[in-house]
């Protein structure tokens, strides 16, 4: 689960729990971004966000935190982070957990085709979302990119 985690909150943890249970995941790795690409800068620097994420995850045995993006001083693109993770763990199957609203703009991310090749996207549908619209967007991305998308209700 990637994100700015500025700050990490209960919604992140609950979403991770729902997805892990719904999809039978062994673990969830939280990856705080280092240099933000799409969001405005904030008061919390990468090291602070990393420490906040570690504190939020606590002693949950299914959760861990990776510093892969925080240690990279350059721009971090999801496609490149997934590629690094895949190269380090070639036999693992990766799920990238996002809020369902992210499906609306994932095509605008750097190399979306590579993202969809390297992982299953787990789109978390929160209360109040138009589930039909989320499913329609997931179907569109599946058709256009061959994306593997699991919609999970939280």
Where are these regions (language model features)?
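Nucleotidyltransferase catalytic core that binds NTPs
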Residues: 1-154
């Amino acid at each position: 689960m990637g994100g700015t985690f500025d700050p990490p909150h209960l919604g992140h943890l609950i979403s991770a729990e729902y997805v892990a249970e719904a999809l039978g995941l062994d673990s969830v790795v939280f990856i705080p971004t280092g240099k933000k690409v799409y969001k405005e800068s904030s008061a919390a620097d990468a090291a602070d966000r990393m420490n906040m994420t570690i504190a939020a995850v606590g002693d949950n045995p299914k959760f861990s935190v990776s510093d892969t993006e925080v240690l990279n001083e350059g721009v971090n693109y999801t496609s490149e982070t997934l590629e690094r993770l895949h190269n380090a763990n070639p036999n693992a199957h990766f799920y990238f957990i996002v809020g369902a609203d992210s499906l609306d703009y994932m095509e605008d991310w750097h190399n979306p085709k590579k993202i969809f090749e390297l992982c299953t996207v787990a789109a978390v549908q929160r209360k109040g979302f138009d589930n039909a619209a989320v499913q329609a967007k997931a179907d569109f991305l599946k058709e256009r990119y061959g994306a593997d998308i699991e919609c999970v209700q939280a």
